[in-house]
Amino acid sequence: TYVSRESKGTKYTYEERLQQSLAIDGYLTYIVGPSKIGKTVLCEKVIGAANMVCMSGNDFSKEKDFWSGIGKKVGISMEAAVSEKSAAFSDKEQKSMTVTKNYFVTKDRVIDYFKENEKVLVLDDFHYAPPEMQYDIACQLKEVIRMGFKAVVVSLPYRSDDAIRLNPDLTGRILVIEIDPWKTEELEQIAQKGFKELQIEID
């Protein structure tokens, strides 16, 4: 059961604020709020489940490459179409060169896939990602949002959000949507709407 709410201090609903944020190129949308407050459901309502590519911060506890992780999620091959090697390089140098080529191929293909298919990356529970990955993700997103890549980062308040909010490279490039705790009357609306859909009468 979904209940639309007005964003505190504005005349807009949370849905309208998210729509406005996603319509602005070059900005990263950052949604922060307590657990079970409807942050992910808000994204589903505005973006649509079919257009969302959802990743969790926990997905990067083992996956150390941001773009490879997303590429796997959407089914993009990590292998470069052509792998070049030169006899002038040692085996170690050849391996390094090939990995670098694969990295850029994966990154470019992921960006193209998202733009061509109008997909939006929703990175949920960002605080679960290891600190070093949080910083890397922040740097990666800072670079690609300028290219039309759409992303929403979802996290808890006062947790590990330093990599996003306090990253100097993202200063002026973040649109923050803070979700307030539920009010009693809003919870009552959820119950009333749910009972109505279930055709259950309440006194």
Q: Which positions does each model-derived feature cover?
A:
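Walker A/P-loop NTP-binding motif
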Residues: 45-51
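Conserved beta-strand scaffold positions in the cores of enzyme catalytic domains, especially
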Residues: 30, 52-55, 174-178
